[in-house]
Curated annotation (Swiss-Prot):
UniProt xrefs under PROSITE patterns: NEUROHYPOPHYS_HORM (PS00264)
Biological role stated in the UniProt entry: Vasotocin is an antidiuretic hormone.
Disulfide bonds: 21-26, 42-86, 45-59, 53-76, 60-66, 93-106, 100-118, 107-112
Protein name stated in the entry: Vasotocin-neurophysin VT 2
Signal peptide feature range: 1-20
Key words, A-Z: Amidation, Cleavage on pair of basic residues, Disulfide bond, Hormone, Secreted, Signal
Region (Disordered): 119-139
Amino acid sequence: MSVCAVLLLCVAGLLCLSSACYIQNCPRGGKRALLEPVSRQCLACGPGDKGRCLGPSICCGEEIGCLVGSPWMARCQEEEYLPSPCQTAGKLCGSDAGPCAAPGVCCGTEGCKLDPNCSEDSESEEPADQNTLGASPGELLLRLLHPNNRKHNQY
């Protein structure tokens, strides 16, 4: 082989092994755009799109409470197929730093649970078994998970 052929093969080999951004495979925003994931708001869900998806089967909002496993969750299934992660609004709570999904409810990777840090007035002192609505935490969670009963049950 001639020196030109060997040199050409070496250059071709280096081009194949390099991690440069070429015209064919360059992502939008350039090579460094992959380092900074774009955060977006989670998809809207629930009646009147008043909630946000917190998982494939959880939809929570201040006005609707938390809906788990209801027909309104079809939109939340789409979240898994979107390329960028979503970010929920609200302060972080719980052991896995999930978001406050609704007043008094913290949702994380393992599901949702009652959390006094998520109440609207978390600075006020309340007895552990009663809240300002006059219901036990269990009753409050049931009311949040079943918002259709709100018309009949007044706080």
